[in-house]
From Swiss-Prot:
It comes from Drimys granadensis. DNA-dependent RNA polymerase catalyzes the transcription of DNA into RNA using the four ribonucleoside triphosphates as substrates. Zn(2+) binds at C224, C296, C303, C306. This is DNA-directed RNA polymerase subunit beta''. Keywords: Chloroplast, DNA-directed RNA polymerase, Metal-binding, Nucleotidyltransferase, Plastid, Transcription, Transferase, Zinc. The keyword Chloroplast applies. It catalyses: RNA(n) + a ribonucleoside 5'-triphosphate = RNA(n+1) + diphosphate. Pfam families: RNA_pol_Rpb1_4, RNA_pol_Rpb1_5. Its cofactor is Zn(2+). One of its GO terms (molecular function) is DNA binding. Belongs to the RNA polymerase beta' chain family. RpoC2 subfamily. Disulfide bonds: none annotated. The gene is rpoC2. It comes from the Eukaryota. It is found in: Plastid, Chloroplast.
Length: 1381
């Protein structure tokens, strides 16, 4: 009795609620004290009592018990307010898209967590006996997070890929979800039908493969006699918490005696219990060697001591226990359970979210300022960081409240600041969990409006895309999308150009994505398709002329050039020295009478350079146009080609010639015929040499258009069918016509001896046709005669004073026939063929030094009042200049910068060097125009790409810019690039004292403030040249015309006293962000963000633009100045995020590790290290030892890291799996080695797979070195490479496995469980056969082993300590391995 009393006195008296963890502790202590049987009896009583009480209490759960937390309303409102501010910052361009996503997720996550914490006190205060409250905090299945969804808010969900959906579900399940919320919640729910089915099957399959690998592992012996061990260090080393250490050690068996000084505190082969672990921790033992399944010396089973305690009853595992199957199931089973958990309903960024501390009431904050340091939060907001515990006092009128803020937290308020109730005063940083998987994610940002791209910093070409349009940002900057769509119609829009204003040639062309309305008439396209070259071959390359813009892509830009400008117009000429201008004058009435469809076409080659004898313009006379096929004949007329070979027009690389034949005669003939080209397989309904009428069916779906003689010629793959109209003459003696063949007969020759001797009215063409050898007849075909008029009609086309040019530029008008004599011309149906073309040929006198080889043509538009005129301007280019231009042109496009010849004429003493210098400074033509009433106030518009540079004057004295304007007297080419950095960087609004100037063409200084008239029309802004990083000049997108609609422009009125008040100067072309406090508007400080387009005395016009912030390393897509459409990719961010620790992502991770196929898998890193080790160790220890220890080390390392990886996933889920289960599996997938080719052995052939232990033993017994290297199997491959073919066949690929086994004559010894189950035998496991093992044999072995051990241990440990440094990087430092001798 006394003993009992004494025992009772030792026991602890519990008087509190026992939850799950307390229950676990109680049971384990009961087992320690009383053993299994007694404990189960006690627990039975507890269970019975529990059920009785529950029945008596009769807890029921109704929907009314779900009480929504009252603080939810304002919490959600608060979060919405924060999201709104965030959205605004994103709109201003202060926060980029990824930051916005992160912050919004954090805002909602923090809100949801705070609600969850509020839930418990709320229930405790309002309704402590509420059944929901009792159940949720009972510690039974079900936890706060589910209740939180019922009464708090459902929160953030992740989609099936584990990405966050940044739209939170604000309702809870008690209030009910809206439709959107319901759909989102279906995504994230782990209970979704699809999800559960798919995940469960995955988990099931994982279990099946695991069991397959280890089913044959059974405990067969008590001790295998191994002398190795794995060291675990109880000193709180890296990554080993005390809890993990206890988990690792308890239930294991010691591999070595442990000494504390000279005293042995634990012996070898002793199993470790709680007491022993506590002693180790107290004594801080250096390192503890334990036995694990890894080091067991048996191949296909395991011994009791290496396995350790059985998890079921806490003693050493019994012989005959099927530990393999238990291991497989313990790893696979949690998977199936975890899929069904609504474990973690969102929060990808949980790793870094912070808890908020809120003020309990209104009051003043007090804290010690010496203990905090100013810093910024991770979102860049100012805060205080406290390094140690900080006590914050909040005092209101009658209450004092103390809040303790833990170290490393952020304080978000100032000292002595007044805070309102529930205001966030501090953020407690979450301890970052070490188990989150980081992954790099690319996020594409898409443009949400169409417009023109612009960036405000230099960008680099990504090295792998040197010729593409992928650019890397070197520093944080804004990308701007300037609003304004591309020009969509070819109507001339309201133009901003005034009189004498120069324009670029490319403005007449059309935007790339729209097909052109200026499109070329069909006949023009016809010539291109059928232009023939002198050798008579068909033109190989058919050019596509859907619009006049030809697209040429080269290295850096995609140039689009107008090839032809097709205008119905007259040419009037206006002359200056060395420059020649032809205006096109639109003349509506005359046009209708004279030229219904065709007009003068001007052809300027792509690069704008014309050579000698080039054709500048041509006119297609409608009289020389045919709609049917036929042959042209000149008779015996001599013709010579105008275009000589060396004068070919060069089209970038591809020489393309369409020779024109100049004629010495005034007439030519056209013989019409109808031609059908049919595929070889078609059936023809008419016979060769038969005569048909009009509209006869030739094939199923073609009919003839004329009547006459049919000729059918079969070529290789097609049939050519021609129909000749005209008479047929059979040969008679008296008929002279029939004697001729293939000639033209002029009118006036009569038929003699016929009834009426009739004269021929027209020319005819006689052709002999021979159907058979003896017979022949003659087809007489009508001929159309064309008279070619002399220069009479040419004078009306091209004005006379143009042709009588007194300058050194010469023009002559030439008629040319487009087809050679006798050449058959094919027409495509419903299109016409032009036979003769009138050309304007350009030539010029040689200079004395003969340096002018080519001229540069450009088109100039001048608008006077409401009449717009276009001029062609031809500049004679001196060849050194063009050479410089070419060499400066990086892409080699041959585009010469438009520096015109004006400067050459202004200053005739330019040398070559000077010319190069001016090239780099010249930025192209900038349009300037005087107002009609000739006031001093000029009017100026910025070209859209901000290419005109604005720089301060050199000699300026004035500050009040509005009243003074200075005349420039210096060189107008002031190099401003040096002062302002390369083009494309935008100067910030700064405090410049001097007025600004633009480099203008006519050297009239513009005043800064300009007037915009008639803003309501849509108008067009053109682009000019752009300088790239090397100072070369480009015109990147010559064909783009941007049209603004009125709502793209904002008109800001300035304060009347603006200049005196602020020092800010608004610069033309400057970008303004919406929130930069540019206080200039009358109606308030806000300007919409955009680019300043027009500056006026009292107002500005801003082209609205949307800024996107981009961080360094982001990839920008597209080119500077490119037009982007809605939905185009703008920029790609790369950022790291932590995967949700959700099992949906967890299971694939486990599977990846077990199948050894993860990208960052151990195999990748280890392969390299292993080779290094093998080399070093071989050098130190010689061949046999080297291979042995090299493979040992490899396998030991990879095993440890595999175990750690798998444990990581499960621990992050809160699932406890004992290491030894994982070890058994990992041991199986790392137990094979590959015989390498380094040394030939008599036993194994190279490339053969053998068990590691077998290789070691064979090597020892043969005393010869076997060279092998470690190999990692996945579980599937390991299952298909076991000792038993029956178990392999029952797993996968049955037929293949059985066939191979039969061919090899494999024998199955039926050692495993599965083979016996398949064949219906008894399985070789079960804990009944203790007496079978002879104890004596094992006892004899032990002393011998220990002797051996002492010999080798010292040396080998030294070697391994040396090698620990080698592989220390890939595993935790607390493991190292002692291999066998």
């Amino acid at each position: 009795m006394e003993v009992l009393m004494a025992e009772r006195a030792d026991l602890v008296f519990h008087n509190k609620v026992i939850d799950g963890t307390a229950m676990k502790r109680l049971i384990s202590r009961l087992i320690d004290h009383f053993g299994m049987a007694y404990t189960s009896h006690i627990l039975d009583q507890v269970k019975t009592m529990g059920f009785q009480q529950a029945t008596a209490t009769s807890i029921s759960l109704g929907i009314d018990d779900l009480l929504t937390i009252p603080s939810k309303g304002w919490l959600v409102q608060d979060a919405e307010q924060q999201s709104l501010i965030l959205e605004k910052h994103h709109h201003y361009g202060n926060v980029h898209a990824v930051e916005k996503l992160r912050q919004s997720i954090e805002i909602w996550y923090a809100t949801s967590e705070y609600l969850r914490q509020e839930m418990h006190p709320n229930f405790r205060m309002t309704d402590p006996s509420n059944p929901v409250h009792i159940m949720s905090f009972s510690g039974a299945r079900g936890n706060a997070s589910q209740v939180h969804q019922l009464v708090g808010m459902r929160g953030l969900m992740s989609d099936p890929q584990g990405q966050m959906i940044d739209l939170p579900i604000q309702s809870n399940l008690r209030e009910g979800l809206s439709l959107t919320e319901y759909l989102i919640s279906c995504y994230g729910a782990r209970k979704g039908v699809v999800d559960t089915a798919v995940r469960t099957s995955d988990a099931g399959y994982l279990t099946r493969r695991l069991v397959e690998v280890v089913q044959h592992i059974v405990v067969r012996r008590t001790d295998c006699g191994t002398i190795r061990g794995i060291s675990v260090s109880p000193r709180n080393g890296i990554g080993m918490t005390e809890k993990m250490l206890i988990q690792t050690l308890i239930g294991r068996v010691l591999a070595d005696d442990i000494y504390m000084g000279l005293r042995c505190i634990a012996a070898r082969n002793q199993d470790i219990g709680v007491g022993l672990v506590n002693r180790f921790i107290a004594f801080r033992a250096q390192s503890i060697y334990i036995r694990t399944p890894f080091i067991c010396r048996s191949t296909s089973w395991i011994c009791r001591l290496c396995y350790g305690r059985s998890p079921t009853h806490g003693d050493l595992v019994e012989l005959g226990e099927a530990v393999g199957i238990i291991a497989g199931q313990s790893i696979g089973e949690p998977g199936t359970q975890l899929t069904l958990r609504t474990f973690h309903t969102g929060g990808v960024f949980t790793g870094g979210t912070a808890e908020h501390v809120r003020a309990p009431f209104n009051g003043k904050i007090k804290f010690n300022e010496d203990l905090v340091h100013p810093t910024r939060t991770r979102h860049g907001h100012p805060a205080f960081l406290c390094y140690i515990d900080l006590y914050v006092t909040i005092e209101s009128q009658d209450i004092l409240h103390n809040v303790n803020i833990p170290p490393k937290s952020f304080l978000l308020v100032q000292n002595d600041q007044y805070v309102e109730s529930e205001q966030v005063i501090a953020e407690i940083r979450a301890r970052t969990s070490t188990f989150n998987f980081k992954e790099r994610v690319r996020k594409h940002i898409y443009s949400d409006s169409e417009g023109e791209m612009h960036w405000s910093t230099d960008v680099y070409h990504a090295p792998e895309y040197t010729y593409g349009n992928v650019h890397l940002l070197p520093k944080t900057s804004h990308l701007w999308i300037l609003s304004g769509g591309p020009r969509r119609s070819s109507l001339v829009p309201f133009s901003l150009h005034k009189d004498q204003d120069q324009m670029n040639i490319h403005s007449l062309s059309v935007e790339q994505r729209e097909s052109s309305d200026l499109s070329v008439t069909n006949d023009r396209a016809r010539h291109k398709l059928f232009s023939s070259d002198p050798s008579g071959k068909k033109e190989g390359k058919i050019l596509d002329y859907s619009g006049p813009a030809r697209i040429i892509s080269n290295g850096h830009w995609n140039f689009i050039y107008p090839a032809i400008l097709h205008e119905n117009s007259y040419l009037l000429a206006k002359r200056r020295r060395n420059r020649f201008i032809i205006p096109f004058q639109y003349d509506q009435e005359r046009e209708k009478e004279l030229m219904p469809r065709s007009g003068i076409s001007i052809e300027i080659p792509i690069n704008g350079i014309l050579r000698r004898n080039s054709i500048l313009a041509y006119f297609d006379d409608p009289r020389y146009r045919r709609s049917s096929s036929g042959i042209t004949k000149y008779g015996t007329v001599e013709v010579d080609s105008i275009v000589k070979k060396e004068d070919l027009i060069e089209y970038r690389g591809a020489k393309e010639f369409s020779p024109k034949y100049q004629m010495k005669v005034d007439r030519f003939f056209f013989i019409p015929e109808e031609v059908h080209i049919l595929p070889g397989s078609s059936s023809i309904m008419v016979r060769n040499n038969s005569i048909i009428g009009v509209d006869t069916r030739i094939t199923l779906n073609t009919r003839s258009r004329i009547g006459g003689l049919v000729r059918v010629e079969r070529k290789k793959k097609r049939i050519e069918l021609k129909i000749f109209s005209g008479d047929i003459h059979f040969p008679g003696e008296a008929d002279k016509i029939s004697r001729h063949s293939g000639i033209l007969i002029p009118p006036g020759t009569g038929k003699k001896n016929s009834k009426e001797s009739k004269k021929l009215q027209n020319w005819i063409y006689v052709q002999r046709i021979t159907p058979t050898k003896k017979k022949y007849f003659v087809s007489v075909r009508p001929v159309v005669t064309y008279e070619i008029a002399d220069g009479i009609n040419l004078a009306t086309l091209f004005p006379q004073d143009l042709l009588q040019e007194r300058d050194n530029v010469k023009f002559r008008v030439v008629n040319s026939i487009l087809y050679r004599n006798g050449k058959p011309i094919r027409g495509i149906y419903y299109t016409s063929i032009q036979l003769v073309r009138t050309c304007l040929v350009l030539n010029w006198d040689q200079d004395r030094n003969g340096s002018i080889e080519k001229v540069k043509a450009s088109i100039v538009e001048v608008r006077a009042n409401d009449l717009i005129r276009d001029f062609i301007r031809i500049d004679l280019v001196k060849s050194p200049i063009s050479y410089t231009g070419k060499r400066n042109d990086m892409a080699g496009s041959g585009l010469i910068p438009d520096n015109g010849s004006d400067h050459t004429n202004i200053n005739p003493f330019y040398s070559k060097v000077r010319r190069i210098q001016s090239l780099t400074q010249h930025q192209g033509t900038i349009r300037t125009l005087l107002n009609r009433n000739k006031e001093c106030q000029s009017f100026l518009i910025l070209s859209s790409s901000n290419c005109s540079r604005i720089g301060p004057f050199n000699g300026s004295k004035s500050h009040n810019v509005t009243k003074e304007s200075i005349q420039i007297k210096e060189d107008p080419m002031i190099p401003i690039r040096n002062s302002l950095g390369p083009l494309g960087t935008v100067p910030k609004i700064a405090n410049f004292d001097s007025p600004y100037y633009l480099i203008t063409h006519n050297q009239i200084l513009l005043n800064k403030y300009l007037l915009l008239d008639n803003l309501k029309q849509t108008f067009q802004v053109l682009k000019y040249y752009l300088m790239d990083e090397n100072g070369r000049i480009y015109n990147p997108y010559p064909c783009r015309n941007i049209i603004f609609h009125p709502f793209d422009l904002t008109w800001c009125f300035l304060h009347h006293d603006y200049c005196e008040k602020t020092s800010t100067i608004i610069v033309l072309g400057q970008f303004i962000c919406e929130n930069e406090n540019v206080c200039i508007s009358k109606y308030g400080p806000q300007i919409k963000s955009g680019q300043v387009l027009i500056v006026h005395v009292d107002s500005l016009v801003i082209r609205s633009a949307k800024p996107h912030l981009a961080t360094p390393g982001a990839t920008v897509h597209g080119h500077y100045g490119e037009i982007l459409y809605e939905g185009d990719t703008l920029v790609t961010f790369i950022y790291e995020k932590s995967r949700s620790g959700d099992i949906t992502q967890g299971l694939p991770k486990v599977e990846q590790v077990l199948e050894v196929r993860s990208v960052d898998s151990i195999s990748m890193n280890l392969e390299k290290r292993v080779e290094g080790w093998n080399e070093h160790i071989k050098r130190i220890l010689g061949i046999p030892w080297g291979f042995l220890i090299g493979a040992e080390l490899t396998i030991a390392q990879s095993r440890i890291s595999l175990v750690n990886k798998i444990q990581k996933v499960y621990r992050s889920q809160g699932v406890q799996i004992h290491n030894r289960h994982i070890e058994i599996i990992v041991r199986q997938i790392t137990s094979k080695v590959l015989v390498s080719e380094d040394g030939m052995s008599n036993v194994f052939s190279p490339g053969e797979l053998i068990g590691l232990l077998r290789a070691e033993r064979t090597g020892r017994s043969l005393e010869e070195a076997i060279c092998y290297r470690a190999i990692l199997w996945g579980i599937t491959r390991a299952s298909l490479n076991t000792q038993s073919f029956i178990s392999e066949a029952s797993f996968q690929e049955t037929a293949r496995v059985l066939a191979k086994a039969a061919l090899r004559g494999r024998i199955d010894w039926l050692k495993g469980l599965k083979e016996n189950v398949v064949l219906g035998g008894m399985i070789p496991v079960g804990t009944g056969f203790k007496g079978l093992v002879h104890r004596s044999r094992q006892d004899n072995n032990i002393p011998l082993e220990i002797k051996k051990k002492n010999l080798f241990e010292g040396e080998i440990r030294d070697i391994l300590f040396h090698h620990r440094e080698l592989f220390g990087s890939c595993i935790p430092n607390n493991f190292h391995n002692t291999p066998e001798q």
